[in-house]
Design a protein with these regions (language model features):
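Sec-dependent N-terminal signal peptides
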Residues: 4-14
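Surface-exposed amphipathic alpha-helical segments
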Residues: 41, 147-177
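Bacterial Sec-dependent signal peptides at the C-terminal "C-region" and cleavage site
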Residues: 14-22
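A short, solvent-exposed beta-edge/loop patch
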Residues: 139-149
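N-terminal "mature-domain start" segment
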Residues: 21-51
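Solvent-exposed loop/turn segments connecting transmembrane beta-strands
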Residues: 46, 133-136, 159-164
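Conserved polar/disulfide-associated segments of primarily extracytoplasmic proteins
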Residues: 48-140
């Protein structure tokens, strides 16, 4: 009996070790943002809307990332960096404009903010599903806001488990400057 427990413990430790030493690559995003993803992931740049697109080989999962540097106009024709609250409001409006059918509603998703490496930020995430070409797609859209900067990360897949597993990569996001 003790041998079975020991074997199970070794198997569990082996799985954890394999995950923790997964080879990762730091990908640069516009405006000083970075994200770490597995080294074998493919990076593309959408030529139309300039999104960064990341996906693993042989998977339905896609991550689309957009970065914005946003200023707020003042009455005296000057401008200041947009506040975190202004950016949060803009992100909320953009996500809530996503057209969902069948009276579906966006649901706010809570993440553990203690796991982030970013200072002075706000995070909002929403999860939803929709149909594209008669195929159900599950998505989580996250906005990370710091003063003057908004990073939007969208996770998409036909498989809900893939998206929920990939959300862990958001904790590797850093703002360099």
């Amino acid at each position: 009996m003790n041998l079975k427990i020991f074997s199970l413990l070794i198997l569990t430790l082996g799985s954890f070790t394999a995950y923790s030493i997964e080879k990762r690559k730091k990908f640069n995003i516009d405006n000083g943002w970075t994200i770490e993803l597995p080294k074998n992931w493919i990076e593309e740049r959408d030529e139309v809307d300039r999104h960064h697109v990341y996906y693993p080989p042989n998977s339905d999962l896609t991550i689309r990332v957009s970065s914005f540097h946003i200023f707020k106009d003042l009455e005296n024709d000057s401008e200041i960096l947009a506040s975190i609250d202004d950016l949060s409001e803009s992100f909320d409006k953009s996500v809530k404009n996503i057209e969902l059918k069948n009276n579906k509603k966006l649901e706010e998703k809570e993440l553990n903010l203690n796991n982030f490496k970013i200072k002075d930020f706000k995070l909002k995430c929403y999860e939803y599903d929709y149909y594209e070409d008669n195929e159900k797609t599950y998505s989580i859209s996250c906005g990370i806001m710091t003063e003057g900067y908004l990073l939007i990360i969208n996770f998409y897949s036909a498989l809900r488990d893939e998206v929920e597993n990939a959300i862990k990569y958001i904790y590797s996001v850093e703002k360099i400057n």
